Amino acid sequence: MAKVSKRMKEISAKINAEKKYPVSEAFDLLREVSSVKFVESVDVSVALGVDPRKSDQVVRGASVLPNGTGKTVRVAVFAKGPAADAAKEAGAEVVGMEDLADEVKKGNMDFDVVIASPDSMRVVGQLGQILGPKGLMPNPKVGTVTMDVAKAVRDAKAGQVRYRVDKAGIIHTTIGKVNFTSDALKQNLERLLTDLKKAKPAVSKGIYLKKVSVSSTMGPGINVDFSDLNI
């Protein structure tokens, strides 16, 4: 317990919870306070000026980060015929229809993303209670139900992140790893915030991007001054 307390004291001495740090300085701080034996992810939280209790203010979507996330993504695709062939060529690990659905029902789900062609939804629709709770259910709003399954596979492999505003009006996602360069993390953050601005509900009034903070997997949140970003 004393060890944890000592670490937290060291972190508190380096990070001012009330300050908004320039982006590059924030990423440098993440590395300074990282003391675990694995390469941590860099997570971001964005507080939005929306009321998620209202259906027309629910912000959800996907963003393809220019420098990826640093994670290896395994993709499963529900498709048949030429679409199935295209998905395999694009790099999908698992492609199928009823046979893939049977594997899902058995609990064999060694994949991180599920993509479906529109004509496969009659099969995928039966798997909602299994895929839904795991955040794997395909949805056209985030591009995982699509005619162009090959592009969706490539996007997933390239570092696409999906997001949905929570009950507090906050988006949580990842933008890379602590061993990324600060420039790479900055570019990823800029792409995410740009896409979030594009997803702003028409009925949202006042300040939309209210607060941005970054953190490593095991680290504290660091408030970011995003006013000088190219968004």
From Swiss-Prot:
Matching InterPro entries, A to Z?
Ribosom_uL1_bac-type, Ribosomal_uL1, Ribosomal_uL1-like, Ribosomal_uL1/biogenesis, Ribosomal_uL1_3-a/b-sand, Ribosomal_uL1_CS
Task: Drop me one GO molecular function for this one.
Answer: rRNA binding
User: A biological process (GO) annotation for this entry?
Assistant: regulation of translation
* GO CC entries: cytosolic large ribosomal subunit
Could you list the residue ranges forming a coiled coil in this record?
none
Q: What's this protein's family per the entry?
A: Belongs to the universal ribosomal protein uL1 family.
Purpose: Binds directly to 23S rRNA. The L1 stalk is quite mobile in the ribosome, and is involved in E site tRNA release. Protein L1 is also a translational repressor protein, it controls the translation of the L11 operon by binding to its mRNA.
Protein name, per record = Large ribosomal subunit protein uL1
Instruction: Say which species the protein is native to.
Output: Francisella tularensis subsp. tularensis (strain WY96-3418)
User: Gene name on record?
Assistant: rplA
